[in-house]
Amino acid sequence: MNVTSFAALRAAAQDIVDEMIADPYGLTSPSVYETARMVVSAPWLEGHRQRVEFLLAQQHEDGTWGGPAAYGLLPTLSAVDALLSVAGTQDARRVAGAVESGLAALAGRFPRNVELPDTIAVELLVPWLIEQVDQRLSRMDDRGDLPGRLDLQADTGTLSGIRELLRQNTGIPEKTWHSLEALGAPAVRSGTVTPMGGAVGASPAATSAWLGDPPHTDAAKACLAYLHQTQARHGGPVSGITSISYFELAWVVTALSGSGLDVDIPAQVPDILRTALGANGLSAGPGLPADSDDTSAALHALDLLGKPESVDCLWEYDTGLYFTCFPKERTPSTSTNAHILVALADRRGQGDTRYDHAAERVGGWLVEQQQPDGRWMDKWHASPYYATACGAAAMARLDGPRTSAALDDAIRWVLDTQHADGSWGRWEGTGEETAYALQVLNHRAAPDRPALEAIRAGRAFLSGHVEDDRRNPPLWHDKDLYTPVRVIRAEILGTLAATQRLAEAEKEARA
C-alpha cells in the first residue's frame, strides 16, 4: 500500500468497516490461555489436535508462553496443565519436552510471591491453575525429573467462596461468568448461569465448563454451535473473548471518524449500538455485563455519527470522585474515566450543568492519577501509551492550567521515550503503541521542531508496518493478553491520516 496516499488510507479503512459489518463476533487474536483450557475441557471438540499444535508452536525459547514478565505466568500455567493432560497421547516427545521446559520456567522465572498483572480474574485463575498442575504432577506414576509440585503461592480462598455460592445454587456476579472454568464441578449446567446466543460470558472456556462432558442434550445445541464456530475462526485455537462486537464497533468508529478519513459508516452501526444500550449502558459484546467503558465509548461514537443518545446511564457508575467500570470492582480504570470525560464533554453547553461538573471532577481525578514522568497506566492495557493517549484526549477537552500542564507532561514523556527507529513501545516498538504516541503529539496545535521530527519518524515507522500485524503483539487485558485486530488497524490508519497535516508542516520546515 502507498500509505502516503490519502485515498489508499481511506480504502483500507473502508475495508475494515465492511469486514466489521459482516462479522458478528469481532476479530481478536487467538489466546494461549483459552486454547489450553479447551484442550483440557473439550478434547471432543473439532480442532483438538490443532489446539495442541498451537500450544507447542507458541512456546517461547525460555519455556514460557504468553506476554513478557509476569504476563507470562497465567498462560504458562494453562499451557503446562493442558499439555500434561495430553501427555502420551499426541506427539509424545514434543509434548514432554514442552512440559519439562514449561515447568522449569515456572520454577526459575516467576518468584513465589510474583506480583500479578491486573488482568481479568487473575486472582482466581492463577491459584486454580497452580492447584490443577500440582494435582496432575502428584498423580503421575513416573515423574522422572519433573517436580512433585510447583513452588508458587496459591491462595484459593476467594475461589472457594465463589464455588460454594454455586454449590448452594446462589447467584454469582455476572462478570464472573467469563471465568466460569475456574469454578469446577459446581459450574456444570449451573442454573444460576444463563448462556446468551450459546455463549457463557462470551468465553469458549467458560461455555465448555458450563456444558460439561458429553453426551450433550438437544438443549446444548446453541452452545455446541458457538464452540464449533469459535474454534473454526482460527482453525482450532480460540480467542479468549468472543463476541466483542459492540466494543469493536465503538472503537473503530471513534478511530476513523476523528481522522479526516471520509469512510462510509452504514446506518446499521449506530442502530446496533443504540439497540444494545440499556438502562445500565452496554457491554463489549452480547453475553457480557454492561460496563461504563464500552458504554461511554459507544456514546461518543454515536455522537460522532450524529446520533447522540442520553448519557444518563453512566450516572450509576459514579462514585462521586471517579466512575467505576463495574459495580464492586477491585481497581478503577484511568482509560475508562477518560472515555467518560469525553462522552460528558460532548454534552457540555447543553443546559445541564451536571455534565460540566462531572467532566471537571473526573478531569481532576485523572490529573491526580498521572505518573510523575507524564504517563498514565491502566488496567485494561499493558502499555502506558494506550492509557496516555486516552488521558491526553480527555485533557484536551478541558480548559484550565492543571489539565493543560498534564497534557504538556504527557507530550514531554512521549517525546522522551521514542525509539531510535521512530517507534514507541513498552517492550519493543509496535505499530499500535506508535499510533497512540502520535495521537498524543497531535493534540499540540502548533508542535515545535522536536515534536514535528518525532511525528515524521513515527509516521515513517507506521508507514512501513501498516499491513504487518506481526508488529502488533497482544497488549490488551482479558484473562491473558490479546489483540483486537480491526481496532488496532483502524487506530493506525486513522493516526496516519490525522497526522498527515503535521507531517507536511515538518517537511516544509526542513525545506
From Swiss-Prot:
Its EC number is 5.5.1.13. Pathway: Antibiotic biosynthesis. Optimum pH is 5.5. Belongs to the terpene synthase family. GO terms for biological process: antibiotic biosynthetic process; diterpenoid biosynthetic process. A motif (DXDD motif) lies at residues 291-294. Homodimer. It comes from the Bacteria. Keywords: Antibiotic biosynthesis, Isomerase, Metal-binding. InterPro entries: SQ_cyclase_C, Terpene_synthase-like, Terpenoid_cyclase/PrenylTrfase. It catalyses: (2E,6E,10E)-geranylgeranyl diphosphate = ent-copalyl diphosphate. GO terms for molecular function: ent-copalyl diphosphate synthase activity; magnesium ion binding; terpene synthase activity. Activity is highest with Mg(2+). Can also use Zn(2+), Co(2+), Mn(2+) and Ni(2+). Optimum temperature is 35 degrees Celsius. Its cofactor is a divalent metal cation. Involved in viguiepinol biosynthesis. Catalyzes the conversion of geranylgeranyl diphosphate (GGDP) into copalyl diphosphate (ent-CDP). This is Ent-copalyl diphosphate synthase. Transmembrane segments: none annotated. Pfam families: SQHop_cyclase_C (PF13243). A divalent metal cation binds at residues 291, 293. It is an enzyme of class 5 (isomerase).
